[in-house]
Amino acid sequence: MTMTDPIADMLSRVRNANNAHHDAVSMPSSKLKANIAEILKSEGYIADYKVEDAKVGKTLTLDLKYGPNRQRSIEGVRRVSKPGLRVYAKSTNLPQVLGGLGVAIISTSHGLLTDRQATEKGVGGEVLAYVW
């Protein structure tokens, strides 16, 4: 059976592994998931990620990041635009997560961007997820 929402699956795996204090989490890979992982890394939510090419399919492995006393770097993750209800935002009406403390991941014509990058470039798009 095919997966209906691979992005929601990725975010759920990250949330569950983070809550269980795992060091890494693996999942099936795609270009979109790798781009989301790149944004999470550049924003400091994960330590690193790698795409491993197996015989069957590619695997994306995220190395989760914790503070000195095992404090989570990711407090929460929420899927916004879903297959049944797409959510779009104009460049003038981009969402801010927790007043700018979190990150909104937006799919634009310039690729995947954070809310701050999309505001700088003046582009809108589909709001995929919030991370804080």
Swiss-Prot record:
A single MF term (Gene Ontology): rRNA binding
Cellular component aspect of the GO annotation: ribonucleoprotein complex; ribosome
GO biological-process terms attached to the record: translation
Top-level lineage group: Bacteria
UniProt KW keywords: Ribonucleoprotein, Ribosomal protein, RNA-binding, rRNA-binding
HAMAP family documented for this protein: Ribosomal_uS8_B
Role description: One of the primary rRNA binding proteins, it binds directly to 16S rRNA central domain where it helps coordinate assembly of the platform of the 30S subunit.
Family membership: Belongs to the universal ribosomal protein uS8 family.
Subunit structure and binding partners: Part of the 30S ribosomal subunit. Contacts proteins S5 and S12.
Name this protein carries in UniProt: Small ribosomal subunit protein uS8
Taxonomic source organism: Corynebacterium diphtheriae (strain ATCC 700971 / NCTC 13129 / Biotype gravis)
